[in-house]
Regions:
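An anion/phosphate-binding loop that grips the pyrophosphate of nucleotide cofactors and donors
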Residues: 36
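Short mixed-charge
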Residues: 1-12, 64-76
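"Short basic amphipathic alpha-helical interaction patches in structured regions
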Residues: 30, 52-58, 94-98
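C-terminal interaction surface of TIR/SEFIR-family domains
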Residues: 1-2, 25, 32, 73-164
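Conserved BB-loop
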Residues: 1-30, 46-52, 111-117
Length: 164
């Protein structure tokens, strides 16, 4: 939040672990996907095997495609984060299309991911990677004009990681 003028009254992000016990998690998740400005998938092998992760991707992609049909926005608002090194991942085609490497992140980030950097005690590299990713996320949020959508757009989501 230090990079933005966000007032801190509400959380600037959504992590599906914050859904309260007894809450309608699908509705809450769909609302978050219909209103967030940036989608930040955390790339792990397990991520690409989870049905709802593929459905979340589908929802956000639909939202971007829908807006492109009705009004322009300035670019893709999916910013992937490598949790492990790229050599440990088999990306489904939909994810392989999205650039996850950037020179400012460096080779160490690509080889180890955030988790690998942290576990190896490479705290300076870890912090610089997190800082660079935070700057990218804020920049994308500010530059893309992705508008909220109606959650009806998400009524028949499919796992876009499956069967590709």
């Amino acid at each position: 939040m230090q990079l933005t003028d966000h007032d801190g009254e509400e959380s600037p992000g959504f992590l599906d672990q914050s859904i309260d016990l007894g809450e309608d998690w699908q509705s809450r998740l769909k609302h978050a996907l219909a209103t967030c400005r940036v989608f930040v998938p955390i790339y792990t092998s397990r991520y690409f095997k989870r049905e709802w992760c593929g459905k979340e991707w589908d929802a956000f992609a639909r939202r971007q495609e829908e807006q492109l049909r009705t009004r322009p926005y300035t670019g893709n608002a999916i910013i992937p984060v490598l949790w492990v090194g790229q050599q440990h991942l088999t990306l489904p085609p939909v994810a392989a299309k999205v650039q996850y490497a950037h020179p400012v992140l460096g080779k160490d980030y690509l080889q180890s991911g955030l988790y690998g950097l942290k576990q190896a005690g490479r705290h300076a590299k870890y912090r610089s990677s997190v800082w660079a990713l935070a700057q990218m996320i804020v920049k994308v949020a500010q530059q893309t004009s992705l508008e909220p959508c109606d959650t009806e757009l998400f009524k028949d989501l499919r796992n876009v990681f499956e069967g590709e």
